């Protein structure tokens, strides 16, 4: 008779940890044995410098299982109160079509993909982004649009920067209409300070008194007024200045588009196109400009090109504008944008089509007209003469009573000064909403009937000269998918073109494409998290308050910092926010002349781009032959900067994939010269539980929650880049003008539109830490084990360029293909494209060293998947040998022909290698074949023939 087990014996230990880690204990031992090691502890001892080791357990609560973690988080969510929020200010309730919710937002085929640097395996989301760009172009009336920015306020700041780059005016002054949203004004002011621009915020009648290089106008403005902007735009153009207009996207279905009014740049938020408010984000900003300014535009642009067979193929265009190439000379520091949310907004337009969108806009406007007429009949005056969905009302001494009445109805209004209240209707509003508002403003005995008012209130709130008369969304894609069946199949067709984590590992160095567990993702669509307005009273967001405070405590414990600022919406924005904190700190000590930022030559391109945005002078520090920061060069340049030294930006482990032994000494050099140390957190996944940035000597660091802490990359966003700071920098991090944050100085400007950035995805990172607890260190150790295993297995075929003590790498390694290219002409790009035929996304290409591939396997990939990648790389090396030996011509071989498509093998095959060698090179590909949608994309053609809108459907055939 078998022995009965007790409940404690039947409880599965480390349940989630074992789900999160790819290799099980037996596989880990096999991997360690291949390295000549007996334990992970031995590996870490050989790899991580002893001087920086964190030799105790993380101060985190014990790990919860998935059910318990979800239950606890559900308890937090239950403390949020989802009221009817009519606050507006760029945030509106919306209805996400369930076919999009289920098949995009909740679908790992969409949310686990990476930025489409490899277009051949990203044609689906590239097409979705092209739809978003076409939607933006049509609704704004301009020539060109990008594929999203972080939020409306950031987009406004980018518009200011673009205006300065292209304006022929010699002025250094930018004008902001005081009727722009206050959070936008704050972010623009913050950015202007970094750039050294003068900023004037005032009424538009003051514009004539200034010479400016550009101006920002709101349409409709923050109080709902709709003004004809043509006289102001003409005035700006007369002085060679640019007109930048922040517009409400839904209103543009009924209003004359700003491009037709003469605007040079139009920007705004696409949030109300099906993306929940989420207590502030994430949301995709749209950004459009005139064709003349295309090379000055920030962010990603999707363009139409052709592939090797001459077929239509999409790609990211004009990448030479961007930070990963131009560094401190880049147009922007944008890296992560908001691709997943842009896709949702674009699909919202595809699903509803032009007629459906117009009906939504007309309905919102009609309800607003009925409300305006009813209130006016009872003597409540309207401040804004014209309107789309927003009313600003004079209520005088009744303000307090009306606010209390609204609270009784669980309605949030916008509270303004001077006895005024504001409200904005949205697509979730209906007749009952209007009736409730009549009750709030007039009392229950108002006697108004919505149906009667609907028949009587014929007048539009939009002035006739500003009614839209041009067509929009005329491309067939916006008319072909209005049934759920057709939409579902369209989404699936696009998804099938792409390669994401749900199909294979994505070994991108410096990107940490780890598991995004389903239990971590579930809470983001809970209504209690998804449907809160970011400016709702704090007591209505008590659950968010608990979640954010707890997450901040955990991140402090993990990093050693004293305080966290959650506002940055991406890693690059975290860099910018951290550098601003350093700048403010120096200024508080009357050392405002400290503006030199030292950056290692190996740094990610966002580092110098962010430093330039923060008003700093970038000085490059060289690296030695081992890939480490050249300590003597660092000392010399710190000495030369002297009292002008602001900071050092350093990545740890380095972007070369090693733990630099001298990192503490590097920090000491900077501190001895009065500078601060900014640690780029891109590689934090190799530190958690093993070392802490603050202990090493960092004063500030950003944490990529979309890397280390499991927020998915979304095909290019969303991301989150909160910063950790030591106590002396804590007063100088970002604050917010609408929702003041405890801790930072009140005068500190915002860096993003919402006080806690993209708050609705914070539950993902909360869940990850709650599920792992102190065992987060296990994840770091297994990530290091996986990287060293790959390095060991591949080093005989592809030399590992850099290694640290005992020949070990950190969590990633760089494979050097330069010798092979010199011998055979086979490049790192050829290998990257060939990996697609094996069913893999390529490693990071030519960063940080040209001619190399940087591989990061993460802790989440099984040994079987690692071995499959090793098999693919060794097979590719054998193919290169065939070229070396002359068996295949230098220009006719599987690498130069890669990637191969179904179209290749269904036509005439006249190549020096077989079809099987081309498309079925391994047993796995014969059983589970992924087909790239297009052949190799012609990048040069795409940039020389720039076209960034939807192409005729016939061109795809």
Curated annotation (Swiss-Prot):
SUPFAM superfamilies registered for this protein in UniProt: PLP-dependent transferases (SSF53383)
Any matching Pfam family: GDC-P
Residues in coiled coil: none
Keywords: Oxidoreductase, Pyridoxal phosphate
Function: The glycine cleavage system catalyzes the degradation of glycine. The P protein binds the alpha-amino group of glycine through its pyridoxal phosphate cofactor; CO(2) is released and the remaining methylamine moiety is then transferred to the lipoamide cofactor of the H protein.
Subunit structure: The glycine cleavage system is composed of four proteins: P, T, L and H.
PANTHER family, per database record: GLYCINE DEHYDROGENASE (DECARBOXYLATING) (PTHR11773:SF13), GLYCINE DEHYDROGENASE, DECARBOXYLATING (PTHR11773)
Name of the molecule in the record: Glycine dehydrogenase (decarboxylating) 2
Organism for this UniProt entry: Pseudomonas fluorescens (strain ATCC BAA-477 / NRRL B-23932 / Pf-5)
Phylogenetic classification of the source organism: Bacteria, Pseudomonadati, Pseudomonadota, Gammaproteobacteria, Pseudomonadales
